[in-house]
Design a protein with these regions (language model features):
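Conserved ABC transporter NBD signature motif
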Residues: 63-71, 78-79
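Catalytic Walker B motif of ABC-type/P-loop ATPase nucleotide-binding domains
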Residues: 159-163
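Conserved ABC ATPase "signature" region
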Residues: 103, 107-130
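A short, surface-exposed alpha-helical micro-motif characterized by mixed small hydrophobic
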Residues: 200-202
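Hydrophobic anchor residue at the start of the ABC signature
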Residues: 148
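ABC ATPase "signature
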Residues: 218-219
């Protein structure tokens, strides 16, 4: 449930161009504390580009990003401190152990006192026994778990996860979803990009559906059902909305 009057994540008029290609165009949405929002869309819809702009890995061509009440352009350190980000493809430091990764993240965010919490997170994700393993020796699934664990070390106000469930075993996926719900219930804003529509339907309080760089629909499941007459499930509505979306015009 949405418990905050002021959104903790605000995207306003976001554009991102790569040469003549407009990957994201005039994107505006917000995520308030106490809700999980799913960012959905087919391949090439602009989801990852949007999340990378939020995480400061890409600089927007135009528009504004505010995280935890801080403008990412004018107050970048404060904005980044409020954010926990998990990329689509985890890339841990090869020569750091699992435990050293968490200690590094805790130090970077001034959360050295949270190592008891870090231990609990590793145990929930079945990484505690691997805490001495180097990043280079981890499997793909373990790298994904490590990236997720690092996101929970400091008490972020905004969580931004790009396809976090890919590569996780069933127990790991279940634990991560429960941890996201717990973060929401504690008042955080959670944005999750996923292609797993059945998971999004069960996990998310709202969804934002993108296609060709723009939002084509957003709302709760009840709101989508009221506006989208085609389809009883999120998957059916998603396919209908993305098929009807206008073709993107590449600027000359």
């Amino acid at each position: 449930m949405n418990t905050a009057e002021t959104p903790l994540l605000e995207i306003a008029g976001l554009f991102k161009r790569f040469g003549r290609i407009e990957a994201v165009r005039d994107l505006t949405f917000s995520v308030s504390g106490g809700e999980i929002v799913g960012l959905l869309g087919p391949n090439g819809a602009g989801k990852t580009t949007t999340i990378r702009c939020i995480a400061s890995l890409l600089r927007p061509t135009a528009g504004r990003v505010r995280i935890g009440g801080f403008d990412l352009e004018t107050s970048p350190e404060d904005a980044k401190r409020a954010l926990a980000y998990v990329p689509e493809v985890p890339n841990p430091y090869e020569m750091l152990t699992v435990w050293e990764h968490l200690r590094f993240i805790a130090a970077a965010y001034g959360a050295e006192g949270e190592m008891v919490r870090a231990e609990a997170v590793l145990k929930r994700l079945d990484l505690w026994e691997k805490r001495g393993e180097l990043g280079a020796n981890l499997s793909k699934g373990m790298k994904q778990k490590l990236a997720c664990a690092c996101a929970f070390v400091h008490r972020a106000r905004v969580f931004c996860f790009d396809e976090p469930l890919i590569g996780l075993d069933p127990k790991g996926a279940r634990e991560l979803k429960e941890m996201l719900r717990e973060s929401r219930d504690a008042g955080a804003a959670v944005l999750v990009s996923t292609h797993m529509l059945d998971t999004a339907e069960r996990l998310c309080d709202r969804v934002i559906i993108m296609d060709r760089g723009a939002v084509v629909e957003q709302g709760t499941m009840d709101e989508l059902h009221a506006r989208v007459t085609m389809g009883a499930t999120l998957e059916e509505m998603f396919l209908h909305l993305t098929e009807r979306a206008p073709q993107e015009q590449v600027p000359p």
